[in-house]
Regions:
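Serine/threonine-rich low-complexity intrinsically disordered regions
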Residues: 2-4, 48, 72, 99, ...
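General alpha-helical segment detector with a strong preference for membrane-spanning helices
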Residues: 33-35, 89, 111, 162
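Fold-independent oxyanion-binding glycine-rich loops
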Residues: 25, 57-58, 84-87, 106-109, ...
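Anionic-ligand anchoring segments at beta-strand to alpha-helix junctions in alpha/beta enzyme folds, i.e.
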Residues: 18-79
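A structured phosphate/pyrophosphate-recognition subdomain
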Residues: 2-20, 26, 38-44, 114-180
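Active-site cofactor/cluster-binding pocket
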Residues: 64-118
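Short, surface-exposed, charge-dense and proline/glycine-enriched linear segments
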Residues: 3, 50-58, 80-92, 172-180
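Structural motif
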Residues: 19-21, 51-53, 80-81, 101-104, ...
Length: 180
């Protein structure tokens, strides 16, 4: 699947739901949390009437990244579930009791067992934050200062300050655009 096409599919999927729950893996690292909070805040800035929640357990040492949400799942009407930075269902944090209609997945880990209606997995990317940044740069989703800061932190953290082998020219180009 061509990358430009996946951006359109993801944007269309986000646009078509009024309620969205964004989850990531248990025991989150900066890439998981920052991609989750960055995407949530971007969707909220772009579509202020949508109900968008970032869920899962809080981590005290990462509190400065932003606050997570605690929605009443019973009041939600089959929201879209977006899973970030998690390859399998049993590692998704914060979705117990959630009745969702579809799953949209963005991840840089190899595919495992999550059944999705839209899935973008690219193991050549440095981080899920890099992928979310590329999505935002190629759609009408807004990048606020806080969104850019979180996505930058996630990229720097998961690439171990640009030292891992999956750090590429596109990693630097994407990160540069966050700094502009």
């Amino acid at each position: 699947m061509m990358v430009k096409n996946i951006y359109k599919q993801i944007f269309k999927g986000i646009k078509s739901y009024d309620e969205i729950v964004i989850a990531r893996h248990i025991g989150p690292d900066p890439d998981a949390l920052c991609s989750q909070l960055g995407l949530r805040d971007s969707i909220r800035a772009t579509f202020p009437d949508k109900k968008v929640y970032a869920v899962g357990a809080s981590v005290a040492k990462f509190k400065s990244f932003g606050n997570l949400d605690h929605p009443n799942y019973e009041s939600l009407n089959n929201p879209l579930l977006i899973v970030l930075d998690v390859p399998n269902m049993h590692r998704i944090d914060g979705i117990d009791g959630l009745n969702y209609s579809n799953i949209l997945k963005i991840d840089h880990h190899p595919k495992e067992d999550i059944k999705c209606y839209i899935e973008w997995v690219d193991t050549d990317k440095s981080s899920t934050c890099q992928m979310v940044t590329e999505l935002l740069l190629n759609t009408k989703l807004k990048i606020t200062r806080k969104v850019a800061e979180n996505l930058f932190l996630g990229i720097v953290s998961d690439s171990e300050r640009f030292s891992l082998k999956n750090t590429s020219i596109s990693t630097f180009e994407t990160t540069k655009k966050l700094l502009e």
